[in-house]
């Protein structure tokens, strides 16, 4: 993944570009500034991954599912991200990306597993942060 500032200042949403060597996550100007301020904090990585990488992966996986198994390889095999994703799915999840088995996967669950389930660590960080109210239910 490469997380960058979206040069289009009129765009106020995160965008994902799969056409490059790496998956590009383009953030609006202000969001990228905030992201940049947090990315150097190791304890914030789980939050940043939950906010950016997980939804980007869900999007990418959904875009791949919309293609036939043969089209997946034809359209994406020259990108590094596709090669890495294909190998990871095969070795860690015993699933070939160009198979119909891929289509049956729960992409929200898979996206979280692909980035080591950042959600739990993100919640722990937020609950234990100095500004937290202790995590009580409303």
Protein language model features and the residues they cover:
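Bergerat-fold GHKL/Histidine-kinase-like ATPase
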Residues: 1-138
């Amino acid at each position: 993944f490469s997380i960058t500032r979206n040069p289009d200042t009129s765009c106020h949403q995160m965008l994902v570009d799969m056409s490059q060597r790496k998956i590009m996550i383009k953030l609006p100007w202000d969001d990228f500034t905030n992201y940049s301020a947090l990315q150097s904090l190791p304890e914030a990585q789980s939050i940043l991954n939950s906010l950016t990488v997980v939804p980007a992966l869900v999007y990418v996986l959904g875009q791949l599912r919309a293609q036939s198994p043969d089209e997946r390889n034809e359209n994406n095999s020259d990108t590094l991200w596709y090669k890495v994703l294909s190998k990871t799915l095969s070795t860690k999840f015993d699933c070939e990306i160009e198979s119909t088995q891929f289509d049956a996967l729960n992409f929200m669950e898979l996206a979280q597993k692909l980035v080591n389930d950042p959600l739990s660590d993100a919640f722990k960080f937020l609950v234990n942060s100095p500004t937290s109210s202790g995590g009580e239910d409303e």
